[in-house]
Design a protein with these regions (language model features):
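Short hydrophobic alpha-helices and adjacent helix-cap/hinge residues
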Residues: 1-227
């Protein structure tokens, strides 16, 4: 059995073998990544857990804190399929509220500062998806965003720990643990890959960086802080 973390790793392993079971975690979308035709009924040697966060809850959080938001920036590496999917899903989540999503793409960490500066004066907030390039440079992004006191919301708790303002996040521990349980079932002969549908996190949790809240001077509703 092979374990794979992230979409690029899963794709590399899936291309290397069609026979050995592969259990993946932290995959945005197994179908769009061409790992299988149906997450509900895996038809390849791949299964696992996805890391799709609750974008509807993320947008609800942003609107609770910034009810007058009109333009939301998103920065991502366009070569990461998981990031492209998240950008499209964010647009869908924002559309009912008339929030325009402003996209900026980067190729490497060297592009982060310039990309962040393009948001200054143009967006009311920034959303960071589970993107490997951007996630590795959150402090650089924050240094620019804080110049204009632009709140940065992260797709996962790690972004907040790196300096972002807030996140309605899934637990990567939980989806990793569940992938481990799937792997154990396969190794023990209890199930085959095709018996195990792709799963996601059962619940999300709110994370707020209170130091960043003070830096931004944001009046966060008590109802949010009490959650």
């Amino acid at each position: 059995l092979i374990g794979a973390i992230s979409t690029p790793a899963a794709q590399a392993m899936a291309n290397a073998t069609k026979d050995i079971p592969i259990v993946c975690t932290a995959i945005a979308d197994f179908e769009n990544a061409k790992l299988m035709n149906s997450e509900a009924q895996p038809d390849s040697n791949v299964t696992g857990t996805h890391d799709r966060g609750p974008l509807d809850k993320q947008v609800a959080l942003i609107r609770e804190i910034q009810p007058n938001i009109k333009r939301l920036g998103i920065m991502y590496n366009s070569s990461e399929i998981n990031s492209l999917i998240q950008a499209e899903n964010l647009k869908k989540a924002c559309a009912p509220y008339g929030i325009e999503v402003v996209e900026v793409t980067v190729n490497s960490i060297n592009d982060i500062q310039q990309a962040a500066e393009s948001f200054l004066g143009d967006v009311d907030a920034i959303f960071v998806p589970t993107d490997n390039v951007v996630a590795s440079s959150i402090p650089n992004l924050m240094a620019v965003a804080n110049r204009d006191k632009i709140p940065v919301y992260g797709a996962e708790a790690g972004h907040v720990k790196s300096g972002a303002f807030a996140s309605e996040s899934i637990s990567f521990y939980d989806i990793g643990y569940r992938a481990g349980e799937m792997a154990a079932d396969i190794l023990e002969g209890k199930k085959t890959v095709k018996d195990i549908p792709v799963e996601g996190a059962a619940q999300s949790k709110l994370y707020i960086n209170k130091q960043e809240m003070d830096t931004l001077g944001l009046a966060v509703p008590q109802s949010v802080l009490d959650r």
